[in-house]
Regions:
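Phosphate/diphosphate-binding glycine-rich loops and adjacent basic-rich segments that engage nucleotide
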Residues: 145-193
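A glycine-rich helix N-cap at a beta->alpha junction
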Residues: 123-149, 219-225, 229
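Short beta-strand segments
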Residues: 109, 143, 151-153, 199-203, ...
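Self-splicing inteins and homing endonuclease
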Residues: 60-83, 136-166
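Alpha-helix C-terminal capping segments
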Residues: 47, 93-105, 187-192, 227-228, ...
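Glycine/serine-rich anion-binding loops at beta->alpha junctions
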Residues: 77-100, 104-116
Length: 433
């Protein structure tokens, strides 16, 4: 069938066949299908959608467009965690070592940040010498010896997604649930982990702004993964304010390590326990209450922290930086944002907080931007807190040579106060399995 006819059928709301979807994906990857036809196809999908079967076929065609990573050389239950992206999200730095300390195998490939969301690889590279590029033998060895490894994605992993996402980004077709699900799951299923825990963020700092859309995305991704023979669970978590207190790179490493040493923010630790419980239910058959108890034990007795140190050492990082935070990159100047009135914090625009951190140099405005590892923010107050005039709302870690006024103004506008008390939303909104 001609590409024109496939586009027309989807435009008219008809269901596509597996060969038709395969033809579109293959043609776009090999260059025989031009951008303008792929853009038309994506817009047709955006408006007409795809059913579960079509979305699974699209995911599978994208998954097989490049390298597939076998984990046959790893002994034990391999599990991955994927977050749909948020602000202050250093979860992988803590969850991986926690699960490794409890006997699971975490073979994780992570990405870099862009825009208001940070990237796991960027945070780890705040540690001097830390290498996110391991060959296959080193990757397998790390998981077998330590139980956890975090590396960057290989160059030829799901090339279809790289090309399709770049086109979606400039054709206003990013926020399509079938296309989001296929993008995420094609990358996750290209690596042969036995289990996958999805952290689907919901709120102002997430791609999914409301719970209904997030739940629809979660259900679709769980079905795709299950159909592919994997164990998959999705946790829907609140991203109406940043996760934890720190936003940046080195500052988030510090908060992650503090959490591994059992002195992190309570809300962040509770998310770690929830995600870990889902992974342990898959891989160790534990109930949620049993799993959360065991997570508390490995945080309290230092086993999870020990796994993080082992991972850093294996991947070439300077362990002394973890043992002594003063060795990590640090900003030269500290400033604070103070309240100009009494009241209660009613709302924190999480996306704006992320953009403010990016403007300080903690993130990328473009894919070629250079990150300043030492700068960042600390949110001192949270939704529901009572505020007096002059109270510090946030701390800023700045370096000279950059106009920080835009970031400071953005931060000020992001934190809203009201005269009456507001009750903060719970962190865990739902679990889909």
């Amino acid at each position: 069938m001609r590409t024109y006819d496939i586009i027309k059928n989807k435009r008219d709301g008809r269901k596509l066949s597996q060969p038709e979807i395969a033809s579109i994906v293959k043609g776009f990857v090999d260059g025989s299908l031009p951008d303008y036809q792929m853009a038309a196809f994506l817009m047709a999908v955006y408006f007409r959608g795809m059913d579960e079967e079509e979305t699974y076929w699209l995911t599978d065609c994208m998954r097989t467009s490049g390298d597939l990573i076998s984990l046959d050389g790893i002994d034990g239950f391999t599990v991955d965690k994927h977050s749909t992206g948020g602000v202050g999200d250093k979860t992988s730095l803590v969850l991986g070592p926690v699960l490794a300390a409890l006997g699971l195998k975490v073979a994780k490939m992570s990405g870099r940040g862009l825009g208001h969301t940070g990237g796991t690889i960027d945070k780890l590279e705040a540690i001097k010498g830390f290498s996110c590029e391991l060959d296959t033998r080193q990757f397998i060895d790390a998981v077998n010896k330590i139980g956890v490894v975090i590396v960057g994605q290989t160059g030829n992993l799901v090339p279809a997604d790289k090309k399709i996402y770049a086109l979606r980004d400039v054709t206003a077709t990013v926020d399509s649930i079938p296309l989001i699900a296929a993008s995420i799951m094609s990358k996750k299923l290209a690596v042969a982990n036995k289990g996958l825990v999805l952290d689907v963020k919901v709120g102002s700092g997430a791609f999914m702004k409301n719970l209904d859309d997030a739940r629809e995305l979660a259900r679709l991704m769980v079905k795709i993964g299950t159909q592919a023979g994997r164990k998959v669970t999705a946790v829907l978590s609140n991203m109406d304010e940043p996760l934890g207190e720190m936003i940046g790179n080195a500052v988030e490493v510090i908060e992650a390590v503090d959490t591994l040493r059992n002195r992190g923010p309570e809300s962040f630790t509770s998310l770690i326990k929830t995600l870990a419980a889902e992974a342990l239910a898959m891989g160790a058959g534990l109930s949620r209450s049993e799993a959360e108890k065991k997570v508390g034990e490995v945080l309290a007795d230092g086993r999870a922290y020990g796994k993080f140190l082992e991972m850093v050492k294996f991947q070439g990082g300077d362990v002394a930086m973890i043992e002594d935070y003063s060795r990590l990159p640090a900003a030269k100047k500290k400033d604070s944002l103070k309240s100009d009135r009494d009241g209660y914090i009613s709302k924190i625009d999480c996306e704006e907080i992320g953009l403010a951190a990016m403007m300080l140099g903690a993130g990328r405005e473009t894919k070629d931007s250079v990150i300043d590892m030492g700068v960042g923010l600390k949110l001192v107050k949270h939704v529901g807190d009572k505020i007096s005039k002059g109270d510090v709302l946030a701390e800023l870690y700045l370096n000279p040579g950059r106009d920080n006024s835009r970031a400071i103004n953005r931060l000020r506008e992001a934190i809203k106060l009201s005269d009456s008390k507001v009750v903060a939303q719970k962190l865990i909104l739902d679990i889909v399995s």
